[in-house]
């Protein structure tokens, strides 16, 4: 028998901007329906989630704005669209929870990361609420204060 190839375990792409712009309330794991050339590109790490979001319509979830750059060696028979909409695969009860929250409570649904789970590509999506500018400044001040405390602790440890 042939030896099984090891698939890379780990993150393909992160959406750091989403963590900066939104308060993440709840996270979900969704499968992604991909074409063959897209999987090859993801193996090469050619993906961006910077301005991506999740559109909920007709009892389905769609990943919008995710950019997967096609490889030069991809198939010439298929015209590769790097920013096409991709279907997200979720359970019915998860979709119902997302629909209810997005329609009533002022939440939005954003993509946080793409990653490998064994040989499958998964997308971590989140139910999130938008941050205001003063919220972002407040988080920045907290980070700076924590950094100062860590510096003080490190320098105190060296003085002993």
Curated annotation (Swiss-Prot):
Principal subcellular localisation of the protein: cytoplasm
This protein's encoding gene: smpB
Residue ranges of coiled coil: none
Xref: CDD domains: SmpB
GO biological process: trans-translation
Biological role: Required for rescue of stalled ribosomes mediated by trans-translation. Binds to transfer-messenger RNA (tmRNA), required for stable association of tmRNA with ribosomes. tmRNA and SmpB together mimic tRNA shape, replacing the anticodon stem-loop with SmpB. tmRNA is encoded by the ssrA gene; the 2 termini fold to resemble tRNA(Ala) and it encodes a 'tag peptide', a short internal open reading frame. During trans-translation Ala-aminoacylated tmRNA acts like a tRNA, entering the A-site of stalled ribosomes, displacing the stalled mRNA.
Gene3D superfamilies named in the record: 2.40.280.10
InterPro entries in alphabetical order: SmpB, SsrA-bd_prot, SsrA-bd_prot_CS
UniProt keywords, alphabetically: Cytoplasm, RNA-binding
UniProt xrefs under PANTHER family: SSRA-BINDING PROTEIN (PTHR30308:SF2), TMRNA-BINDING COMPONENT OF TRANS-TRANSLATION TAGGING COMPLEX (PTHR30308)
Disulphide connectivity of cysteines: none
Protein name per the record: SsrA-binding protein
Matching Pfam families: SmpB
């Amino acid at each position: 028998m042939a030896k099984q190839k090891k698939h890379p375990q780990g993150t393909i792409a992160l959406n750091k901007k989403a963590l900066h712009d939104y308060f993440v309330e709840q996270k979900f794991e969704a499968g992604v329906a991909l074409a063959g050339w897209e999987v090859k590109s993801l193996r090469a790490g050619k993906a961006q989630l910077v301005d991506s979001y999740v559109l909920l319509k007709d009892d389905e979830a769609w990943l919008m704005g995710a950019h997967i750059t096609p490889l030069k060696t991809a198939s010439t028979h298929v015209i590769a669209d790097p920013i096409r909409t991709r279907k997200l695969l979720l359970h019915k009860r998860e979709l119902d929870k997302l629909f209810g929250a997005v329609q009533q409570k002022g939440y939005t649904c954003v993509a946080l990361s793409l990653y490998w789970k064994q040989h499958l590509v998964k997308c971590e999506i989140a139910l999130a609420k938008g941050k205001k500018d003063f919220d972002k400044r407040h988080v920045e001040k907290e980070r700076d204060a924590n950094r100062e405390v860590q510096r003080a602790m490190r320098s105190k440890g060296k003085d002993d």
